[in-house]
Amino acid sequence: MPGPESLSSNDPASIGDYSVEGRLGKGGQGVVYLGRDRDGEEVAIKVLNDQWAENDELRARFEKEVRAAQKVASFCTAAIHEASLDSDPPFVVSEFVDGPSLQEAVAKSGPRRGAGLQRLAVNTATALVAIHRAGIVHRDFKPGNVLLGPDGPRVIDFGIARVDDGQATLTNSIVGTPAYMAPEQIEGRGIPDKVDVFAWGCVMAFASTGNAPFGADSVPAVVHRVVSAPPAVDGVPEELLPIVQACLDKDPSRRPSAKELLMRLLGH
């Protein structure tokens, strides 16, 4: 994983009881810092930006996401250590996963193969089962949100996740990454949990071939292919291909659930 960016004069030296050592990234909700706790353990600290922190509705939705994410089995994602949601600004401290994203790993070393690909498939499907069991639809499952830690893959970034209570965590607008979005997600026909299964199929195709199955060029071209064209899955290993194809069915009712997907991967 690339090292953290240096801190600027506008960045805090500490947050709560944690020292801040660098920036790990910046997203729509805020900034993620690399920090250390009092025992010297590295952590990731997400600090909400003003737009989220000062908007009661967005803040409440973020709090709901955090509470739901805390229910997800810790071996599947970056475990949340502390959620200081009443501080100014609110921040969340999670486990720091020291490893590249799947996107970075494939770009550097090429497609996954053999036992490594099988482990990736099983572990990420297990993570989706745990995420859905916690009542969450991730909505942005993609190679950049799979970290390859020393002890296995972790699914991260629930920033646009939907808590399964009938309310989207941002709005009912289309959100996600087009190359890994399901047709019904693109068309705004609702966000069932099987959008994550479709995304899993896209991610496994990418992991095994180095290419997203609907391309990664212009957004209109990708969107058209997702909705209307068959996926490009040449190069997906024979043992994985039927499962990936089932996950990439345009009709969500014909896709397996995350649990059914996992059972198929395990040979049940």
Task: List PLM regions with ranges.
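Protein kinase glycine-rich loop
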Residues: E21-G27, V32
